[in-house]
Design a protein with these regions (language model features):
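Amphipathic coiled-coil/heptad-repeat helices and related helical stalk/stem segments
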Residues: 3, 25, 152-153, 184
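C-terminal substrate-binding subdomain of Rossmann-fold SDR/epimerase-dehydratase oxidoreductases
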Residues: 21, 154, 160-303
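Short, conserved catalytic or interaction motifs in soluble domains
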Residues: 38, 145, 205
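Proline-centered turn/helix-capping motifs that create local helix->coil transitions or kinks
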Residues: 84, 96, 131, 147, ...
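Generic recognition of short, well-ordered alpha-helical segments
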Residues: 5, 31, 52-55, 147, ...
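N-terminal Rossmann-like NAD(P)+-binding domain of SDR-like oxidoreductases, especially those catalyzing
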Residues: 1-142, 211, 267-277, 281-303
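The catalytic Tyr-centered alpha-helix of NAD(P)H-dependent dehydrogenases
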Residues: 97, 108-115, 145, 149-153, ...
Length: 303
């Protein structure tokens, strides 16, 4: 889901250096740590798409588990002062009532979620065993500008704008908590600076909505017919509901989400409308191959 175009504008900043590399490559990562001697590591690097993890879990294990292990070893060796692991609410699994707290048991359902849960456990182990100063954030479903078009919201926006079918898994009643990307970034920044070492922090948007509601809302904003909705066979192991308790991050750091779903989704739609070139580039190559292969199995050949 990475895209170099997302980094435009950073090239001229003196403290910015881009290196294209695989975090699971210990030799390459060792060279980077040796050269730059980072004081802190914030690990956003991950394979993140659940559908891809079901089709091909190996890259998820390689990046999300082995890669994190490489970063932890090097952080320990080079005396990194703070290691922040970016994780996901999916490590908790599904919850029908109530909300997950940071001390809730991990019960991942998909290979993606399992790889992130494994990484979280590894990160915590380096704190307990070696005293590495770590933090973990677990965010709910992100959305907003620059999101790769394989994810639900940009997929719906893109297909609807082009009058193509919009796939909805199962009955569409799966609930997700939608977090605008700028809210997430603000929370991560605050956790990095003010979070307590060794702690986990949930980050949510307090916008719990069914997938079907989200799809219908986007279609309404785009003045498109709901006839574009096509219900497809449910995803294996599809979690029914995610919900995060934000009590800890409110009490300890004073953060709360600020962007409502209506405001955030309108901003997102407008961004995709204005950035057709970015979309075209993002949809080329591997994305297009995956898209055709995966959705053709669901009977959506026109996509």
């Amino acid at each position: 889901a990475g895209n170099l175009e997302n980094l435009k504008g950073l090239e001229k900043k003196g403290n910015y250096h881009f290196i294209r590399a695989d975090i699971s490559s210990a030799s390459v990562m060792r060279h980077i740590f040796e050269k730059f001697r980072p004081e802190a590591v914030i690990n956003f690097a991950a394979e993140t798409h659940v559908d891809r993890s079901i089709m091909s879990p190996a890259p998820f294990i390689k990046t999300n588990v082995i890669g994190v292990g490489v970063l932890l070893n090097l952080s320990l060796k080079y005396n990194v002062k703070k290691f922040l692991q970016i994780s996901t609410d999916e490590v908790y699994g599904s919850i029908l009532r109530g909300s997950f707290r940071e001390d809730s048991p991990l019960d991942p359902s998909s290979p993606y979620a399992a790889s992130k849960a494994g990484a979280d456990a590894l990160v915590v182990s380096y704190y307990k065993t070696h005293g590495l100063p770590i933090l973990i954030t677990r965010s709910s479903n992100n959305y907003g500008p620059y999101q790769f078009p394989e994810k639900l919201i940009p997929l719906v926006i893109l297909n609807a704008m082009n009058n193509k079918k919009v796939p909805v898994y199962g009955d569409g009643m799966n609930v997700r908590d939608w977090l605008y990307v700028e809210d997430n970034c603000e929370a991560i920044d605050l956790v990095f600076h003010y979070g307590r070492i060794g702690e986990v922090y949930n980050i949510g948007g307090e916008n719990e909505l069914t997938n079907l509601f989200v799809v219908r809302f986007i279609l309404k904003l785009l003045n498109k017919s709901e006839s574009l909705i096509t219900f497809v066979k449910d995803r294996p192991g599809h979690d029914r509901r995610y919900s995060l308790s934000l009590g800890k991050i409110r009490r300890q750091i004073g953060w709360h989400p600020k962007i409502s779903f209506e405001t955030g989704i309108k901003r997102t739609i407008e961004w995709y409308r204005k950035n057709q070139k970015w979309l075209k580039n993002a949809q080329s190559g591997e994305y297009r191959n995956f898209y055709k292969k995966y959705y053709s199995k669901l009977g959506l050949k026109e996509i």
